[in-house]
């Protein structure tokens, strides 16, 4: 869908009520870098390029307001930078907070570091597997993941990073109820469900106080 810049800005304001023009410019710059780099490496499915603003950028933008008061974020399997780069752009506007990105693919790491440098974002990229990052990232207040794994596997991945105060914000599609049921066989957790503002079939699962039945 070919939105004008003003249309994109108005759509963004439906997600976040106050956005500076400088932040809008950063988001547009990020969008252009995605399109440019996606010709050479698979950051997002090429079929979603026409929907890049809504399906990826706005979908990511809705995450940050849920806990914008918390300062140390960590995004797992960051890929093309959704939601991590979008979150970092809003942190830059707020002049507070930092997000750590974890990505194992070297080409995607190069892309993420390029974006962070060009936009001067409060973010650090760790080029490693998620399982190996626990010695590098300590006590994140918020953990995010988008399209990474089923909930049961996600909880296994994030569990070593969790503290009593850590919140996980996990974006899930239409099968989220089944994923919750399957994960509940192995894990106990406190759960809040936030309906997506972009896709009526999707949710953001806010998970805390994760306990494993397996000890």
Curated annotation (Swiss-Prot):
S-adenosyl-L-methionine binds at residues 77, 82, 130-131, 146. Its EC number is 2.1.1.170. It catalyses: guanosine(527) in 16S rRNA + S-adenosyl-L-methionine = N(7)-methylguanosine(527) in 16S rRNA + S-adenosyl-L-homocysteine. Disulfide bonds: none annotated. SUPFAM superfamilies: S-adenosyl-L-methionine-dependent methyltransferases. GO terms for molecular function: rRNA (guanine-N7-)-methyltransferase activity. It is found in: Cytoplasm. Keywords: Cytoplasm, Methyltransferase, rRNA processing, S-adenosyl-L-methionine, Transferase. It comes from the Bacteria. HAMAP family: 16SrRNA_methyltr_G (MF_00074). Specifically methylates the N7 position of guanine in position 527 of 16S rRNA. NCBIfam families: rsmG_gidB (TIGR00138). Belongs to the methyltransferase superfamily. RNA methyltransferase RsmG family. PANTHER family: S-ADENOSYL-L-METHIONINE-DEPENDENT METHYLTRANSFERASES SUPERFAMILY PROTEIN. This is Ribosomal RNA small subunit methyltransferase G.
